[in-house]
Amino acid sequence: MDEERALYIVRAGEAGAIERVLRDYSDKHRATFKFESTDEDKRKKLCEGIFKVLIKDIPTTCQVSCLEVLRILSRDKKVLVPVTTKENMQILLRLAKLNELDDSLEKVSEFPVIVESLKCLCNIVFNSQMAQQLSLELNLAAKLCNLLRKCKDRKFINDIKCFDLRLLFLLSLLHTDIRSQLRYELQGLPLLTQILESAFSIKWTDEYESAIDHNGPPLSPQETDCAIEALKALFNVTVDSWKVHKESDSHQFRVMAAVLRHCLLIVGPTEDKTEELHSNAVNLLSNVPVSCLDVLICPLTHEETAQEATTLDELPSNKTAEKETVLKNNTMVYNGMNMEAIHVLLNFMEKRIDKGSSYREGLTPVLSLLTECSRAHRNIRKFLKDQVLPPLRDVTNRPEVGSTVRNKLVRLMTHVDLGVKQIAAEFLFVLCKERVDSLLKYTGYGNAAGLLAARGLLAGGRGDNWYSEDEDTDTEEYKNAKPKEELLKPMGLKPDGTITPLEEALNQYSVIEETSSDTD
C-alpha cells in the first residue's frame, strides 16, 4: 500500500508532495532489508518513477528524498533488474558530481545529494551484475578517483570521501581489471595513501617517520570510517604485490608501510572501531613486500633517548640491578629501536587468540605478518623472541599450560584447524631461528611433532633459512632440568623407517649439541 500511494504521488509530478510522501516512505522503511514479493512489481515501477523525477529541475531537498527511497529499494536485487540501465546510471553519476571534471565542490547545499547518490551507487553496484558491467563501460573507477582528488584535503566532506572510497572498494573487489587500472593507470596507490595521510593528519619528521602524539585526541568517527574504507580499497589494489620490481614501487610501499605504522599507534573513537582500524591495517601490511616492512621500526628520537637516560639517572648509582630492570621492562625499545608498532601487533595477536573463535579470519593474518617480519628483519625477530619466548624458567609445567603468550601459541600448535596450527608453529619455529632443539625446549616434542614431521626434521637439525649466531641463553633452571628433558628427545629414524636404537640416537644428539648452541 505504501508503494502504491508513493507511486501515485510521484507520477503526479508536484515536487512538494513528492518530497513529503517519499520522506514518509523513507522514515517507515529505513530499517527494511527484506521485502514482500507480492509488492515487487510496484517497487519496480516506483524506482522507474523516481528516476524520471530525478532528471527534472527539482529542489535539492526533493532530490535527497528521492535518492533516500531509491537507496532503500536498491537493497532488493529483483527490483534492480529492469531499472539498471546506462541512462539511469548516468543520472546517478551526474548527481554524485562524477561527470564534472572542473567542479570544485563549493556548493555545500549539494553535499547531501552527492552522498545519497554515492550510497545508491554502492547498493546498485553491489547487487546488480548489469551495474557492474556498466561501471566498466562508464569508466566509473576513474571518475571516483577524480572526485577523491577534489576532496582529498577537505575534512568537512568526509561523508563524500567515505562513500566514494566504499564504491571504489566494491569495484576493485568485483573486478580484477579495475584493480589493475587503479594500480597503474589511475595511480591509486599514492592517491589512497594520501587519503590515509589526510585522515590521520600525519606530520612527517623524516622520509618514513611521522610524529606521534600519544596524548592527542582519538580519531573522529568520520575520519575513522574514511580510513577504514581507504585501507580496504588499498588492500584490493595491492593484493597481488608480492615482489617489488622498481625503486619507485619500493619507495611507495615504504611510504604506505610508514602510514600504517602511524595507524597502529593511534586510536579510534571506540575500542571496537580501533580494533577494526588495526585489523584492516594488518591485512594491508600483509600485502606489503617484506623487504619494505623495515619502516615499522625506527631509531629512537633524541627526545626518546633523553627520556630513557633520565629514567635511569633518577635511580641511585648503586642500584645497578634496578637499572637493568628498567631497561628490560621497557617493552617499546629494543637495541636502540622504537618497537611500538611491533608491540601493538603482538598485543593485537594476543587479543585475537583470547577471543577463541574465527582464528582463520582473525588470527592468521597477524600471525603470518609477524612470522614474515621475524624471518626477514633481525631486530624484529629478536624483540619478539624476548617478548614471546623469554628465558625459560618454568620447567615444571607443560609448555601449553599457563596464560603467557608462549603458552597460548603452544596450545594453538595442536588446534583442529590445520592452517591455524601450521602458522602458530611456524611463528615459534622462526623465533627459534628454525632450530629443532630450541623449538623443543619451548614447546615440547608432542606439540612440535606436526611441524617437524612436515619438514622432515623429526631427527633434529634446523630449517633451511640462515640466521645470525648469538650467545647461549639457557637459564640455570633449564640447565638443571635438561638431563631429564633429554630423555624425551625424539628417536632417530633409519632409511627403512625403523627406529634407531637409543644408544645410537643419543650419540647423534650429542654430536648435534656439540656443534650448535641455543641462541638469542
Curated annotation (Swiss-Prot):
Check the record and name the Pfam families matching this protein. Ric8
**Positions where Phosphothreonine occurs in the chain:** T473
- Phosphoserine sites (modified residues): S468
Q: Which GO terms describe its cellular component?
A: cell cortex; centrosome; cytoplasm; cytosol; plasma membrane
Q: Where is the composition biased (Basic and acidic residues)?
A: 476-488
Gene Ontology MF, one: protein folding chaperone
Its localization reads: Cytoplasm, Cell cortex
The UniProt entry lists the main location of this chain as cytoplasm
Single Gene Ontology BP annotation: G protein-coupled receptor signaling pathway
Record region (Disordered):
468-494
Question: InterPro entries this protein is in?
Answer: ARM-like (IPR011989), ARM-type_fold (IPR016024), Chaperone_Ric-8_A/B (IPR008376), Gua_nucleotide_exch_fac_Ric8 (IPR019318)
Keyword Glycoprotein belongs to the record: no
Q: Which UniProt keywords apply?
A: Chaperone, Cytoplasm, Guanine-nucleotide releasing factor, Phosphoprotein
UniProt subunit comment: Interacts with GDP-bound G alpha proteins, GNAL, GNAS and GNAQ. Does not interact with G-alpha proteins when they are in complex with subunits beta and gamma.
Would you identify the family this protein belongs to, as annotated? Belongs to the synembryn family.
Protein function: Chaperone that specifically binds and folds nascent G(s) G-alpha proteins (GNAS and GNAL) prior to G protein heterotrimer formation, promoting their association with the plasma membrane. Also acts as a guanine nucleotide exchange factor (GEF) for G(s) proteins by stimulating exchange of bound GDP for free GTP. Acts as an important component for odorant signal transduction by mediating GNAL (G(olf)-alpha) folding, thereby promoting-dependent cAMP accumulation in olfactory sensory neurons.
Protein name as annotated: Chaperone Ric-8B
Organism field: Homo sapiens (Human)
